[in-house]
A protein has these predicted regions:
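Thiol/disulfide oxidoreductase modules built on the thioredoxin-like
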Residues: 89-96, 102-147
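Short active-site neighborhood of thiol/selenol oxidoreductases, capturing the structured segment around
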Residues: 34-51
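Positively charged n-region of N-terminal signal peptides that target proteins for export
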Residues: 1-4
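Conserved hydrophobic packing residues within short motifs/helices of P-loop NTPase cores
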Residues: 41-43, 75-77, 121
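Short loop/turn microsegments at loop-to-beta-strand junctions
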Residues: 19, 41, 117-118
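N-terminal "domain-start" segment that seeds a small globular fold
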Residues: 10-34
């Protein structure tokens, strides 16, 4: 019972904290949840040394490229790196088209405890955190989830 209560409190803290995030990407652009009202927002924590993180990058690129001008924003937060240039060079080599934030513990704290990498947070168009996943994601899973929630509200 105590574990359930602690888990619930952690999830509530994540929701309350993450709703106010402010992230500056590698190009100097500031991303806030409020600036994306009306759109789904996917925030993905990853690292260059993390195989599951690398496996999901093509899906994140595909999601960003398909929906960036319509209903979904993708933001990547690189964690556990020693050299920012290494991360940015890696992102270029992978043709990552979505914004990359050079993360740290202060940035991660805006979302609550980071359980592992990769971790993905999904916010609905109203700005509410509606899902998060520790571990890899797929394009199909994200699209299915968004479509299921979008059809419910119609």
């Amino acid at each position: 019972m105590l574990k359930r209560i602690l888990l619930l409190l952690t999830m509530l803290a994540v929701t309350a904290t993450a709703s106010a995030f402010s992230l500056t990407d590698s190009k100097g652009k500031v991303h806030t949840l409020d600036s994306y009202k009306g759109k789904w927002v996917l925030v993905n924590f990853w690292a260059t040394w993390c195989p599951p993180c690398l496996d999901e990058i093509p899906a994140l690129i595909a999601l960003h490229d398909k929906y960036k001008n319509s209903r979904l924003e993708v933001i990547g937060i690189a964690m556990e790196y020693q050299n920012p240039k290494q991360v940015l060079d890696f992102a270029d080599s992978m043709f990552i088209s979505y914004p990359i934030v050079l993360g740290n513990s202060k940035i991660a704290a805006q979302f609550g405890p980071l359980q592992g990498l990769p971790t993905t947070y999904l916010f609905d168009p109203a700005g509410k955190m509606v899902a998060y996943q520790v571990g890899g994601i797929t394009q199909q899973a994200v699209e299915s989830y968004i479509n299921s929630k979008s059809t419910v509200k119609k």
